[in-house]
Design a protein with these regions (language model features):
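Helix-loop-helix "hairpin" substructures at the membrane interface of multi-pass membrane proteins
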Residues: 89, 93, 103-104, 108, ...
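Structural signal for alpha-helical transmembrane segments and their membrane-water exit/capping regions
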Residues: 19-34, 62, 134-139, 176-183
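Transmembrane helix-bundle core of multi-pass membrane transporters
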Residues: 115, 119-181, 210-211, 231-236, ...
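Single transmembrane alpha-helix segments in multi-pass membrane proteins
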Residues: 19-27, 36-86, 111-116, 250-262
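Transmembrane alpha-helical segments in multi-pass inner-membrane proteins
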Residues: 220, 234-297
Length: 306
C-alpha cells in the first residue's frame, strides 16, 4: 500500500465526521428545529462517549473487549450521587466515582486474566450485576422515572463547553502519551497484534490486561462525572448503551476491533462523535429503534471492509 493511499485511508474518519455534521445541521435546519439545542445534545453525548471510549482503547488494543462499561458508568454515577447527598463533599464524590469505575474494570480484568474466565462471560455478568444494583438503588431512593440527583448548583459552574473540552483534551493527551510514547503502549500493541510472539518474548499478557482495564476504569470514572455535570441526575437508563456504542465508535474512528499495531487513540474521539451525530440524524429521520439498528449495520460494513 502506497504512502498516499495510507494517508487517504487515515483521513476518511475525519472526512466522514465533517460530512455527518454538515448533513446533521442541514436536517435540523430544514425541519425548523433549534440548531443550538441539538448541537448541545450531540456535544454532551459525544464528550461522554469519547472519554469512556478513549480509555477502552487500551482494552480493545489487546484484542479484548468490555461491554459492561455502560453499566459501570451508571454504577459509578449512582455511587457519586449517593456520596454527595450523604456528605455534601464534592471532592469525595469525585474520588468515589473514579474509584468505582476503576474497581469495576479491575474486577473484569482479574476474572478474565487471573481466573481465565472468558471475557464475554465476565463482562456480560458484570453488566447485569452492575445494572441491577444501580437500578435497585435508584428505584429505592428516587423512583425509576425521576431517579436520584444532586443539587444542580453543585456542578452548574462546570457545565460549560470550555471545561468539558478541557477535560477531554487532557484525558486524550494523557492517553496518547501513554499509548504512543511509553513502553507500556508499545507492548500493548505488540500483545494485541501477535500474542504468541509477545509471550515468547517474555511479555506477560495478564500484566498489560490488568493495566489496560485500569485505564479504562479511569475513563469510566471521568465519563460518569461528566454525565453528572451535564445532567445532575441519574436514572435507570443513564449511560445504558455506552458499552455497545464504544465498539461501533471505534470502528467508525478507523480502528480494527482486533486491536494490535493499527490501534489509535484518536479513533475513540472521532468515532465517538461520528456515532452520536449519525444516531441523531437517524433519530430525526426515522424512529430511534430502527436508527440504532442501522448504525450497527453500518459499523459491520466498515469493520468487514477493513
Amino acid at each position: 500500500m502506497t504512502k498516499n493511499k495510507k494517508m487517504m485511508i487515515s483521513a476518511l474518519p475525519f472526512v466522514a465526521l465533517v460530512v455527518l455534521l454538515a448533513v446533521f445541521c442541514g436536517i435540523v435546519s430544514s425541519k425548523g428545529y433549534r440548531l443550538d439545542m441539538y448541537i448541545k445534545i450531540v456535544f454532551n453525548e459525544g464528550i461522554v462517549l469519547s472519554i469512556v471510549a478513549t480509555g477502552a482503547i487500551f482494552i480493545y488494543t489487546l484484542g479484548s473487549f468490555d461491554i459492561s462499561l455502560g453499566a459501570a458508568t451508571l454504577f459509578a454515577a449512582t455511587l457519586g450521587v449517593l456520596t454527595y447527598n450523604a456528605t455534601e463533599n464534592f471532592a469525595l464524590m469525585i474520588i468515589v466515582i473514579l474509584l468505582a469505575g476503576i474497581v469495576c474494570s479491575l474486577v473484569n480484568s482479574v476474572l478474565a486474566s487471573i481466573f481465565h474466565i472468558p471475557v464475554f462471560v465476565t463482562t456480560v455478568a458484570m453488566m447485569s450485576v452492575l445494572s441491577a444494583i444501580a437500578s435497585q438503588i435508584i428505584t429505592t431512593k428516587g423512583g425509576a422515572v425521576g431517579g436520584i440527583s444532586i443539587p444542580s448548583e453543585v456542578v452548574k459552574h462546570l457545565d460549560n463547553s470550555a471545561f468539558k473540552i478541557g477535560v477531554l483534551v487532557i484525558w486524550v493527551a494523557i492517553c496518547v502519551f501513554v499509548f504512543d510514547y511509553t513502553k507500556f503502549g508499545r507492548r500493548e500493541k505488540f500483545v494485541g497484534g501477535n500474542p504468541i510472539c509477545a509471550q515468547l518474548s517474555g511479555i506477560k499478557y495478564n500484566t498489560y490486561a490488568i493495566l489496560g482495564f485500569l485505564l479504562a476504569g479511569v475513563g469510566v470514572g471521568i465519563g460518569a462525572f461528566m454525565t453528572l455535570v451535564y445532567t445532575p441526575s441519574v436514572t435507570t437508563t443513564t449511560a445504558g448503551d455506552i458499552g455497545m456504542n464504544i465498539m461501533v465508535a471505534i470502528v467508525f474512528g478507523g480502528m480494527p476491533i482486533s486491536g494490535g499495531a493499527r490501534s489509535k487513540i484518536y479513533a475513540a474521539v472521532v468515532g465517538g462523535f461520528s456515532y452520536i451525530v449519525l444516531n441523531n440524524i437517524l433519530d430525526l429521520l426515522i424512529d430511534s429503534t430502527s436508527g440504532y439498528g442501522i448504525t450497527q449495520i453500518v459499523s459491520c460494513l466498515l469493520y468487514t471492509s477493513d
